[in-house]
């Protein structure tokens, strides 16, 4: 996809995300998230607002004529169109419910299995991130760049333990143990998208997570790539969990080799 096309779609995504953010602001004013009805599916939390944001974003993005795959719409997970929007209407739902940390509205554009561009709105900091490979990355209109940190011993690493992670898998657990042993600092903040944009901004140095869903990370990956970062993510499906390593080139190469 050409840079000019990416820029056009990125503006469309920004517009849709800002409409969703307006809805969040109005909804939380009328009905605080602590009293929202929610469903617990295993370790997953689903709020009313997840579904309502999904419907709003889908309506906005459908105007482009491009199909939308949403985390909150299982029927959309089998869409096979070459170009699709991939959205997580509210990444970090549990944080949102409990006011426990960051959450985000996320929209990405995919061509096949290639992430073209994405937008992440951090609802806690009220910052809008956007970007994609070859078109740069911005935070509230200001260019951002990943860090140049090359030593894991000096690195701030973002990670998480998603609900789909196999806690009996010694390889996955071993990677987390190695991070705890060698990284200078580890942060688990409950939102993959915000973790990724923090890495894109140079706040953190690298992000690593096992068994994370593509809609949780696609928009954030686009921003990291736009910010000059390296991403290793074996995306084989738009709706199956993947392992992601993203950030400074040296650290991604190091952690991907494990």
Residue ranges and their predicted role:
Residues 1-22, 26, 174-181, 195-258:
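Oxyanion/phosphate-interacting regions
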Residues 1-90:
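N-terminal subdomain of lithium-sensitive/metallo-dependent phosphomonoesterases centered on the IMPase/IPPase/PAP
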Residues 67, 117, 205-206:
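Short, Asp-centered acidic motifs that coordinate Mg2+ and/or phosphate
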Residues 67, 184-185, 230:
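Conserved beta-strand segments of alpha/beta enzyme cores
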Residues 71, 189-191, 234:
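Conserved beta-strand termini and adjacent loop/short-helix elements that scaffold enzyme active sites
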Residues 81-125:
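Glycine-rich active-site/cofactor-binding loop and its immediate structural neighborhood
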Residues 92-93, 157, 224:
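Conserved S/T- and glycine-rich ATP-binding loop of Class I adenylate-forming
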Residues 108-195, 243-258:
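Acidic beta-strand-loop-alpha-helix segment within the catalytic core
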